[in-house]
């Protein structure tokens, strides 16, 4: 495949055109008066969204040089989304501003390597200021504010705050599509795993087709049970106690399953059997989680334990257990608080150490199940188009909320960046080109407020001047068109989102400025298909 090469100013300008096309498409969504972007889909209805990263991912440009520029800025949005889950529009906007200001200076003959140094110095200072000015999230109200600003909807803010309150910071909150028009919150208290009863004859409520066991014993094993003689000794002890039993095993089949079902139907003894959750090593760990939560032991040959030797003190207990066709929920396991805390700490350490995203996700699920619970936000809307748009906004709001809990909140509406300018202005250096890098960031930090104002139909420069000369904490509420104390008014952003957007934008933009040559593939031209021959039409002497 032949390649095309561009050098110097020409290469940077070609890539900048791509950066501008992508950034201009994304930045119209910024702020409370930002608009939506409609994305064409090959299948189904178009997607309407104001989510920066979703828009960026859809953009592919025909010109290979422009496309390279667009892909670089796309990385800014994607990385910010991965780290903080929100702030992708701000990150794209900042990258565009740094590239625009930087290229002016590089074109005028400044050394891009020294400019890059100045950019890094200014960004580090601004990030430090953002961290210093952040305050910890204090209760449900702060969480609701962060989510409401991110989703541009107070109702969504309230819903997510409720979910966080119910499952705690360690709990898992998922977003699913609802079959109704209403958006609702569904919370699963206790530990739930996706395994249901092995036989429908085990249900205690035939109408709802579920088995509910109050204060039952729980037998946990990683073995397959097929011989009833293995579990007969422990069954006899439980019958004498007048209790019910939940068996969680690799499988229960044949004679053992048939005997349990017959005894249940006769009313002699209630026992529900379910398969153990997970696979391989993950199954062993999940059984251990359940054992710690319920105060029982896992009966495993690896540990030298046989099912026939099980005693009552090896069984777990819980306040209640609900088993449906697909799920088992254990509520209020009677395990030791200290052991549960140790297990939570152990899983947290594993999350920090693992490099696999898949493992991290699975560990996070296990942590939620043992620590808090699972909340499901069921998103409803009148049409599929609105549903998709709403779901994206809720996912962003959820990510913003988690980021706020991690690193606290700062004044929203781009105000935190303006406050950081004062610290950046204090920086100085003997080298004039490093000073240029600092000045580029100083100018770029104004860009979010400019764009929010522009999307609201106002002049950004006037607003920036007023905020910079105003009291500490003052910012511009673009929705109401007034100057207010941003934190008191509840216009806040997560510090992690604000910080990540700036760091990722500067990282890609400063590398962009050091480009001196661009190599792209020349697209192959497909030869035009030849016209089919017209047999039998030839005439003598004619070709």
UniProtKB/Swiss-Prot annotation:
One of its GO terms (biological process) is protein refolding. It is an enzyme of class 5 (isomerase). It is found in: Cytoplasm. It catalyses: ATP + H2O + a folded polypeptide = ADP + phosphate + an unfolded polypeptide. Keywords: ATP-binding, Chaperone, Cytoplasm, Isomerase, Nucleotide-binding. InterPro entries: Chaperonin_Cpn60_CS, Cpn60/GroEL, Cpn60/GroEL/TCP-1, GroEL-like_apical_dom_sf, GROEL-like_equatorial_sf, TCP-1-like_intermed_sf. The keyword Magnesium does not apply. It comes from the Bacteria. NCBIfam families: GroEL, PRK00013.1, PRK12849.1, PRK12850.1, PRK12851.1. Belongs to the chaperonin (HSP60) family. Together with its co-chaperonin GroES, plays an essential role in assisting protein folding. The GroEL-GroES system forms a nano-cage that allows encapsulation of the non-native substrate proteins and provides a physical environment optimized to promote and accelerate protein folding. This is Chaperonin GroEL. It comes from Clostridium botulinum. The gene is groEL.
